[in-house]
């Protein structure tokens, strides 16, 4: 069996998943599941021109990834070098074409790094994140989603704020988000015109405070990433899957590091929220139910 073969189902898989979710709530000590964290004093407090790496995944979200990559072209860093790593599958032909188009661009301060995975490995996001964490040479690694953009002053301010820091995990205090957009919204309904720089009006976003390093906002110290990986020792989260897996490992990662993260005032962190989930089968009953549940959940939150 190669490393990306889908393992046969086991009777206890569902129980194992539930156990890890309960453990990650803090009810079980994280040190039982990982090696000792590198002490803060032994982490490099990098300064000067930093090396940053952004790690993103894309499956059937080329229309969102186009905005993310465009933001790096439109607002390239000047006080750091950013390696933009994207995990993708060649079966997603729109994303493959988009990466080829952007990959031909020379952008000051940006290094393109496209990492192909078979889709069964892509469907478990922790697999790519773990590979990137262990292989990265960056001072800091930003694990994110392909619907996030790095707009004006985002990466340069981040580089300034990270000077000399040794935190295990930091995150933006404010995330600027759109409303939850339906598939027919002009921002999402780009037709076939993906191979171009995508523009978005700053007025489309509102400020939303964040209290922890959620999945797209996990900015991790490079020494921590290289020694811990990304849920490396939770083998349940390193198993390929035939279908997209909900990213419960985001919470497990914070639990393993023993922190919700340190908030930083980073401008220009913008996300396009979207109702239709491209990673699920279009028209599928479960997909429609998920959309209904998301709408209901957001409506409840907005009324609080």
Where do the model's predicted regions map?
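Glycine-rich, basic loop-to-helix element that forms the pyrophosphate-binding segment
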Residues: 118-135
């Amino acid at each position: 069996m190669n490393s990306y073969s889908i393992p046969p189902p086991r009777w206890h898989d569902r129980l194992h998943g539930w156990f890890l979710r309960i453990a990650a709530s803090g009810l079980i000590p994280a040190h039982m599941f990982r090696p000792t964290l590198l002490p803060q004093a032994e982490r490099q407090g990098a300064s000067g021109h930093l090396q940053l790496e952004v790690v993103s995944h894309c499956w059937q979200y080329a229309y969102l990834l186009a905005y993310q990559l465009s933001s790096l072209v439109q607002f390239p860093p000047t006080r750091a070098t950013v390696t933009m790593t994207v995990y993708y599958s060649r079966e997603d032909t729109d994303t493959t074409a988009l990466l080829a188009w952007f990959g031909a661009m020379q952008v000051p301060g940006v290094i393109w790094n496209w990492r192909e995975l078979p889709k069964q490995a892509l469907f478990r996001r922790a697999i790519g994140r773990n590979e990137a964490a262990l292989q990265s040479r960056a001072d800091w690694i930003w694990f994110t989603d392909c619907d996030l953009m790095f707009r004006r002053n985002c990466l340069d301010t981040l580089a300034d704020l990270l000077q000399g820091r040794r935190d295990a995990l930091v995150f933006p205090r404010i995330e600027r988000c759109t409303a939850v957009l339906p598939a027919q919204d002009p921002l999402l309904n780009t037709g076939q015109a993906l191979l171009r720089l995508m523009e978005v009006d700053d007025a489309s976003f509102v400020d939303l405070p964040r209290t922890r390093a959620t999945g797209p906002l996990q900015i991790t110290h490079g020494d921590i990433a290289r020694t811990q990986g990304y849920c490396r020792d939770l083998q349940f989260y390193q198993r390929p899957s035939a279908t997209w897996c909900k990213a419960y490992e985001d919470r497990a990662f914070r639990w393993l590091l023993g922190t919700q993260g340190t908030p930083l005032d980073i401008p220009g962190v913008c996300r396009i929220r979207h109702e239709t989930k491209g990673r699920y089968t279009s028209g599928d009953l479960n997909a429609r139910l998920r959309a209904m549940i998301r709408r209901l959940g957001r409506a409840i939150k907005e009324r609080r």
